[in-house]
Structures are given as structure tokens and as C-alpha cells.
Amino acid sequence: MLIDSLSIKVWMLRKVESAGLHIQSMKHVRPVDARRHLSNPLELNYLYPGRELLLEAPMEWGFGLFNLSGHRRFLNDVMQEAFDNPGRERDLLRDALRVFYADWQPANAAEFLGVSFGQASELVDAPPWQAYSPWDAHNAVEKSVKRQRTELRENTRILGKRLDISAGWKFCGPVSEDKLEVEVERLARVLESIRRQGICRHDGTDGDIRACVLTHSDGRWRWMVHGGQHRYAVISALGAPRAIIRVERFIRREDVALWPTVTLGLFSQEIALKIFDNYFAD
């Protein structure tokens, strides 16, 4: 008896589903290409509910690794010099990062977020790497475990030996010499890739800089990097005026009363808005 291809496909789908898995066409999961959209991107959230969005965002409105408030553009000069001098990039980046990690050593998660000790008491006793934004879904234990696993995986992949978060966190100092080398190497590899083939993207899971968009009631918006931190750091430091980002979610200022950490009483609305508004400061 001949078995047609459709029957085989149905049989395979049933097997996959019986294992608790689901197969979906790429056209349903690839981001909506909205790079030509010029007005407030929040509009797209209503046009394409539940979909990830591809935007071309002004670089000056973005925040991420080595480019948070108070440290913006410190890599710009050295990154261009590193780009123009193949073979010297690691030495140049190492010197710059050593200064950054020595200068920026917040005592705890509260200081990392820029709030006083009395404004977020839970964060005073937490190390900087346990900081979270007021709009994050609050599960401190899960977030801590995930961040530790991510750092361990990234460090081990680059260094070739086990190195956990006790050696330091990429966003601030202090860091060990091994952790410094991990960050130097990650930036250098991105820089070399851009030098070789330009800035590339694809529709896969790791194909873009992933971000959330913060929207103000007056129409202004900013974006925060969630994934692709080193790509963002290099591209922004090289002076690109805009970046292609994949937007995963929108955070509306007027929804502050609904933000998870606010409803749980971990942040007051006043402090939550202070953290939010810091991203809109000139």
C-alpha cells in the first residue's frame, strides 16, 4: 500500500503533539517588519497584538550594556579606534573596560537602579546583579537563578572553563581578570564580525537585538535591550544613528499602578516612575 506524503505529515504531527510539542510555521513566529513605521510604535501593539515587531529605532533613545544612564557613550572613541586597528582591538577594549569596571561599582541593587536606600528596601541587601525594573514580572528567585545560569553559560563558552557570577556581572564592577577577559572577547568578536561582513540580522531566535519599548503619555518613547547586549554595545559605540531592534513588549507609563512590583508593594508608584523617567532625562 502506498503512503502519500500528506499521511506521513499528519502522522508526524500527531507524534509530535503526543509528546507535548507544537510545530508552527515560521511565518507565524517571525517578527512583523515595521521598519518603515515612523510614528509612535505603540500603535503597532494594537495592530499586531501578541506579535514581535521589527523596528528601526533611534540609537540615542536606546539603553543597554555599557550605555546606561550615567555611562553613555564612554566606549565610542575606543570602539572606532579598535575597528580601525585590526589586531589591537582586544588591548584597546581591555584598557577601556578596566577603567569602566573600576569606576562603576554600585554597593547594591538599589544603587544600581539609582534609588536611595529608603526607597526600595528589598534591594538594599541584594547585590547589583539581582536588580530588576519595576515593570518586570517579579519572581526574585527565578530571576536570580536564570541570571546565574546565563552568566555561567556565557562565561564558560568564551573562557573554556567554568566561571560563575561570583566573578562579576557584565553590567558593573568589580569583576575578576577572567570576567574582564570574557567581556573583552565578546565585544572583540562582534567587532570583528561587523568589520568582516557588516551588521547582519535574521529572523531566528538570536537574529536581532531584543528590546522592550517604554512609552510616555506625551508620545515620547525609549527602548531597553533585553538580548544582544554586546551587539548593541558595539553598534552604538561605532556611531550608528539607528538600530534594528525586535520589540518583545511595551511598557506604558500610565500603567504604573499595574506593574508587578508596584502591586506587590516592592516599589511605590513614585519610585517606579522615577526609575522609568530616568530613561527620558536629557
Which residue ranges define each predicted feature?
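Short alpha-helix boundary/capping and kink motifs at helix termini
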Residues: 79, 83-93, 154-224
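Amphipathic, charge-rich alpha-helical segments that serve as recognition/docking helices
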Residues: 252-282
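Extended, charge-rich helix/loop segments that form flexible
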Residues: 101-171, 176
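Membrane-proximal basic amphipathic "stem/tether" segments
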Residues: 1-77, 85
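A sequence-level detector for short glycine-anchored, His/Arg-bearing signature motifs
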Residues: 216-238
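A structural boundary/capping signal
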Residues: 84, 90-97, 111-117, 121-123, ...
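Glycine-rich phosphate/pyrophosphate-binding loops
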Residues: 240-249
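Short, solvent-exposed loop/turn segments at secondary-structure junctions
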Residues: 60-61, 216, 230-231, 250-252
